[in-house]
Design a protein with these regions (language model features):
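Bacterial N-terminal signal peptides that target proteins for export
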Residues: 2-11
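Bacterial N-terminal signal peptides
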Residues: 10-20
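Non-catalytic beta-sheet/beta-sandwich ligand-binding modules that flank or precede catalytic cores
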Residues: 25-294
Length: 294
């Protein structure tokens, strides 16, 4: 059935291996550019919390979390990769517009599990109602640490971020240059070609696909714009010659470049990719982070 296909996609974006057939997408709304709040910094932060589905996780979600069927899903993106051993449900609180406070039923880092990707945590539970009492804040209330992959381990405790509403489309929240040693994927996602000279990972607030449920292709590749910045300060916009990290159902894409000029920013135009709720992306822009700056 159509609704099963749609919601299995959402789970598939957050759980490796579940596939989707079709998806019914809503129409693109008025144009606006969503500027990611990411800047190179050593301080921990929450980059986004995205209300993905409301009371709609499918029955198969019980394989991940007993009782997840018909619950809500909120992916939260962190500034640094997370230490999975410190990840607990009680680390999180979700506040609703009406003043309710909820603790997730369960949390998971899957399926974004390649090196450098483990910064998206999916919260599953009852987090209000999209119409009458939507979730508005995600807060870290326990000792949740980064994994120290870049710099020393950092504590996210005390941080919070506003929840993107259910009917808003997904935006870019992070772009980072990937060290060449990490270009190869450990999961089923596709790799950038060996002739790549630079690879930029972009992270979306939630899972994104085409409106028909398929992965992005050459058309979408040509819509990505990477701004390169030369040593003299001049800039040039280029298009990636290939896309990587496709087919693994997470919220990351790899932009494969044939230039070694440092990438400065990434943008993507509105109305081409949809989230699990069928909402189209807005115009979106994010500055590129070099992991050596973190």
């Amino acid at each position: 059935m159509r609704w099963i296909s749609k919601y299995c996609w959402f789970l598939g974006l957050m759980i490796v291996s579940f596939m989707i057939g079709g998806l019914s997408a809503t129409e693109a709304g008025p144009k606006q550019t969503v500027m990611a709040k990411t800047t190179p910094t050593q301080k921990p932060s929450l980059l986004s919390a995205f209300f993905g589905l409301d009371d709609s996780l499918p029955f198969i979600a019980n394989l991940l979390c007993l009782g997840a069927w018909d619950k809500d899903g909120i992916p939260v993106v962190f500034s640094h990769t997370v230490n999975p051993d410190s990840l607990q449900t009680e680390d999180f609180q979700v506040l609703t517009r009406g003043g309710g406070v909820a603790t997730p039923l369960c949390v998971t880092l899957r399926p974004a599990s390649d090196v450098g990707e483990t910064r998206t945590v999916l919260l599953i539970g009852e987090f209000g109602n999209a119409v009458s009492d939507p979730p508005v804040i995600v807060r870290i209330v326990g000792d949740l640490f980064s994994d120290g992959a870049v710099g020393r381990p950092l504590n996210f405790s005390g941080l919070e971020t506003v929840v993107t509403p259910l009917n808003a489309g997904p935006a870019l929240v992070l772009a980072e240059v990937i060290p060449e040693s990490n270009w190869s994927q450990s999961t089923p996602g596709t790799d950038c070609p060996r002739k790549s000279k630079q690879v930029v990972r972009v992270t979306w607030a939630g899972g994104v696909r085409l409106a028909d449920g398929e992965e992005p292709g050459d058309t979408e590749r040509e819509l990505y714009r990477i701004t390169l910045r030369y040593p003299d300060g001049s800039k040039e916009d280029v298009v990636p010659f290939a896309l990587g990290d496709l087919g693994d159902r997470d919220n990351n894409h790899h932009l494969c470049l044939d230039s070694q000029i440092p990438a400065y920013a990434v943008s993507f135009p509105s109305g081409h990719l949809v989230d699990p709720n069928g909402d189209f992306n807005p115009d979106t822009w994010v500055q590129v982070v070099d992991v050596s700056d973190l």
